[in-house]
Amino acid sequence: MGWWSLGSSGSKADPEKSKANDSKSSNRRQQEEGEQSFIPPPLTSRTSSSSSSKSTTDWNSSLNAFDWSQFKQPRNLIPTALLTGGILFVVYVQRRYLRRFPEATDISSSYFRSRSLLGRVTSVGDGDNFRIFHTPGGRLVGWGWLPWMKVPTARKELKDKTVHIRLAGVDAPELAHFGRPAQPYAYEAHMWLTSYLMNRRVRAYVHRPDQYKRVIATVYVRRWLDFPPLRRRDVSYEMLRRGLATVYEAKSGVEFGGTENERKYREAEMLAKNRRQGLWKDFGKRGGVNFESPREYKTRMQSLDMSAESSSSSSSSSNTEKNPGLVGSLLRKVWPFGSKKDGT
């Protein structure tokens, strides 16, 4: 009857036919694998160049890519902000509080009537002016005790490095200079100011510059041998109280540093007058010498200088007329008619 019958389950299939189907499926799989492994050659040079440039661009873009999100993390953001803020704060403090001015002409205009200078007195030129070496920050930043922040003492080292200060509100007797004689009590005022300020640290509240490349300032000093110790003293007030200076009087350019200082200075001058201290010793006495203030002394010296200049110019012109010189003598020989003074 054969191996296949109607009652048997399955499909009617021939063994040879199934083998053929298996061979076809294997051939199909091999063909698909061959297509996948096959890489077609480049079509043109243009296509290859475009693909290479594209790959180069992708490589550069991947190298230049930067991830900014890492800076937004607190572990990176907080130290960066603190470091930047610290640098800006140090620069601000240095420019505003630790900037050193070599001379009075270098002082910034923002300092006048609002800021002060801390420095050490290096020389006293007269009874009302002296020079300081500006030391911004003082001992707190190392001036005087750090090796590289010493105040110079030699005259050559101090050249063009000191601020010339004129005391505000006072006028001291003039020392002898420019051929002029010294005024009474000029030496005493100069010696007192030298002993009071020399080599000491002072604080000068600057008001404005003057025509002599100085800066007018109200100056304060602290001394250990004071009562109470280290009490802040106004140098101008102390000079007026001791009768070593007068209140500055002029038609213009008077600087007191405020109305309160002017009132205080005039009261100190009046007190010295009443006590007849210093240069007020013979003031108002009958038969005593006539009192001459520093302002009156300067005015008298200026008038004497002007009269001396006028007399010297007139004498030089008369000498020129009497002695005409080589050119004049030659002209007289050429022109024999003389002059009007000869009566012709």
UniProtKB/Swiss-Prot annotation:
Gene3D superfamilies: 2.40.50.90
InterPro entries recorded: SNase_OB-fold_sf, Staphylococal_nuclease_OB-fold
Biased composition (Low complexity): 44-55
EC number: 3.1.-.-
Region of interest called Disordered, as start-end residue ranges on this chain: 1-55, 291-327
Polar residues compositional bias, start-end: 1-11, 300-309
Membrane topology term: Single-pass membrane protein
Molecular function in Gene Ontology: endonuclease activity; metal ion binding
Subcellular location: Mitochondrion; Membrane
Residue ranges, compositional bias (Basic and acidic residues): 13-22
Name of the top EC class for this enzyme: hydrolase
Keyword 4Fe-4S (UniProt): no
Signal peptide annotation: none
Binding site for Ca(2+): 171
Domain of life: Eukaryota
Domain TNase-like: 115-282
Entry annotation: catalytic residues: 166, 174, 214
Transmembrane segments: 77-93
GO CC entries: membrane; mitochondrion
Record key words, sorted: Calcium, Endonuclease, Hydrolase, Membrane, Metal-binding, Mitochondrion, Nuclease, Transmembrane, Transmembrane helix
Family membership: Belongs to the LCL3 family.
Protein name, as recorded: Probable endonuclease lcl3
Organism the protein comes from: Talaromyces marneffei (strain ATCC 18224 / CBS 334.59 / QM 7333) (Penicillium marneffei)
